[in-house]
């Protein structure tokens, strides 16, 4: 295993081979930490967070027999990013109007005025 923290960073997903202790990442090759939407671009319900977490667990289990690598983490991160886009498109997630920046990174909101 690696002596450095492996990580995947997308716009809305961060995955680390680490645990969080006192706001610091501590290397732990037997543990993956998932940080969802670190910039709070979206308004999340408990149900939508659970869906992302469950899908994350499913993706990790599918990779259980493979060596953990940067590529594997990037693949999981990309699939989670696509899943979040689907939640937004399906209306299970919405943009956070109190977000620091409104950049609509996954496309304009689907409203009656824009359809």
Curated annotation (Swiss-Prot):
Catalytic activity, EC: 7.1.1.-
One Gene Ontology MF term: oxidoreductase activity, acting on NAD(P)H, quinone or similar compound as acceptor
GO CC term (a single one): plasma membrane-derived thylakoid membrane
InterPro entries xref list: NdhM (IPR018922)
Pfam families: NdhM
Top-level division of the source organism's lineage: Bacteria
Reactions listed under catalytic activity: a plastoquinone + NADH + (n+1) H(+)(in) = a plastoquinol + NAD(+) + n H(+)(out); a plastoquinone + NADPH + (n+1) H(+)(in) = a plastoquinol + NADP(+) + n H(+)(out)
Primary localization class, coarse: membrane
Membrane topology listed for this record: Peripheral membrane protein
Subcellular localization(s) per the UniProt record: Cellular thylakoid membrane
UniProt keywords, alphabetically: Membrane, NAD, NADP, Plastoquinone, Quinone, Thylakoid, Translocase, Transport
Disulfide bond entries: none
Assembly description: NDH-1 can be composed of about 15 different subunits; different subcomplexes with different compositions have been identified which probably have different functions.
Biological function: NDH-1 shuttles electrons from an unknown electron donor, via FMN and iron-sulfur (Fe-S) centers, to quinones in the respiratory and/or the photosynthetic chain. The immediate electron acceptor for the enzyme in this species is believed to be plastoquinone. Couples the redox reaction to proton translocation, and thus conserves the redox energy in a proton gradient. Cyanobacterial NDH-1 also plays a role in inorganic carbon-concentration.
Protein name: NAD(P)H-quinone oxidoreductase subunit M
Organism, scientific name: Prochlorococcus marinus (strain NATL1A)
């Amino acid at each position: 295993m690696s002596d450095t923290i492996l990580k995947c960073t997308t716009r809305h997903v961060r995955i680390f081979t680490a645990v969080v202790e006192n706001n610091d990442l501590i290397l732990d090759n037997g543990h993956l930490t998932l940080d969802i939407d670190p910039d709070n671009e979206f308004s999340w319900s408990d149900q939508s967070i659970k869906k992302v977490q469950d899908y994350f667990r499913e993706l990790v289990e599918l990779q259980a027999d493979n060596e953990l690598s940067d590529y594997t983490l990037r693949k999981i991160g990309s699939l989670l990013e696509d899943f979040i886009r689907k939640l937004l498109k399906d209306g299970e997630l919405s943009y956070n109007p109190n977000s620091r920046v409104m950049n609509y990174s996954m496309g304009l909101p689907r409203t009656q005025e824009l359809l």
